[in-house]
Amino acid sequence: MQVQQPQQIQQQHLQQQQAQQHQQQQVQQHQQQQQQQQQQQQIYQQIVNQPVNNVHQLPSLQQQQLLEQYDELLKQVSLIRSNVSDFFNSFIEDAKQQQTIVNKEEMKQKLKKSMDLVLGSISSIDKVSKRISSYSFQIASSNFSTQEASWAYSTGIYDNRNIKVQLEIRNENYWRSQTSYKSSLASSNLENKLKDLFPIIFQEDEESSSLSKKRKQISSLTSNSLSTTTITTTTTPSPLFKLPSTPPTLLLSGTISPFYDYFAQIERVIHSIRQESALEIFEIQKQSSGAPKGLFVECPDVFKCLICFGIPNDRKDCFTIDRISFFGVKENFDSLWASSKYNIFKKISENSFEAISYYSANPNGGSILKCILSWIWSFRGLFLEECKGCQDILHLDSPQYMYLPPSFRTFDNYTPYHPSCYQNHLLSCNSFSSSTSSSIQQSPFSPLNK
């Protein structure tokens, strides 16, 4: 016990000495930090209070010399960076070679050479900076750090709320992209499974879609409501998502004559459209009878589309246009039922049903397919033409499709419109016609007032 007591006393003395040394080191570090801060504040005040000469008041020759000195300064800074990076890259290359023996003399020479170059660049930077100090702020990284920190905290870049919002936006974007990708995979897998489980749906007998049947029902209903004695025609373009106002030709029995295109006329129509436009048209998927199932149409550098045909049950030599699907130039599709991933082409595909209904009821003695192809050719300036109504290219279409270029073309002269702008145009035309008719009735020279 007597031997252990002096040892304990020595240990306590050592611990106390270590604690005192640690406290002294902390005090010294704190004092050094305070001195550095005071020096930085003094330098910053000197920079603020330092008068800066106006460069534009100097002669042109002196201005040129000043610019050359700035170029020399930037050149020396780039040399320092390149020398340092080359020196460390040499270490990396030596490590990749996995050399067991290191040549110390060679490493010393490399280090000495790089240090000489760096010191030479620093000395030249000091010389040039002294020359241009009266025309610019003093170049020193320590000063810039304080200015940068004060600016960053004043602008709120490092605010926790801003960082939280940025993280939420990034997570939301990632979730949306993943959802879109997985939903597209799920839809393609579902379509493939349906083809395997229900092949009858995709056979030739089922090609006439429900849309063509609905058009036939609508045409039969309108024929019953019309009389055989009065036929009214209008020159105003039809409103969106409604059947055209111009009724088709009536037979003596009071029923509407169906308008079909013949398979024998397809080659002639394609040849005519190729002469009038730059569309590239190809027949796709020959049927057992030799007739095509549709057409593949491409407008160079703008879009491509699929035109799907339907065959009436009573007329096997004729066809109707059931559906038109628009796609981007670089989009791929492996089915006649595919749809585009771009909102603008989805919107034009929706508007194509209106075009099919209009031209099917108003062929004007020509081919329905030719009218449809001419309407498709009118979208060649899809991303360049302005809307006739708002005089803009992009316009808010809907929350689903967001901002789109003009996706609607009038059926008589192919004027580009946004759908909402076209509806406003129709309303203004109707209000103008009603106002003119009322003014004519109120006029003292009107025959109604005589």
UniProtKB/Swiss-Prot annotation:
A Pfam family found in this protein is Med27
Ordered alphabetically, the record's keywords are: Activator, Coiled coil, Nucleus, Transcription, Transcription regulation
Q: Where is the signal peptide?
A: none
Subcellular localization, as worded in the UniProt entry: Nucleus
Keyword Transcription recorded: yes
Q: Please, which domain of life does this record's source organism belong to?
A: Eukaryota
Function as written in the Swiss-Prot or TrEMBL entry: Component of the Mediator complex, a coactivator involved in the regulated transcription of nearly all RNA polymerase II-dependent genes. Mediator functions as a bridge to convey information from gene-specific regulatory proteins to the basal RNA polymerase II transcription machinery. Mediator is recruited to promoters by direct interactions with regulatory proteins and serves as a scaffold for the assembly of a functional preinitiation complex with RNA polymerase II and the general transcription factors.
Name the UniProt record assigns to this protein: Putative mediator of RNA polymerase II transcription subunit 27
Taxonomic lineage from the root:
Eukaryota, Amoebozoa, Evosea, Eumycetozoa, Dictyostelia
Which gene is annotated as encoding this protein in its UniProt record? med27
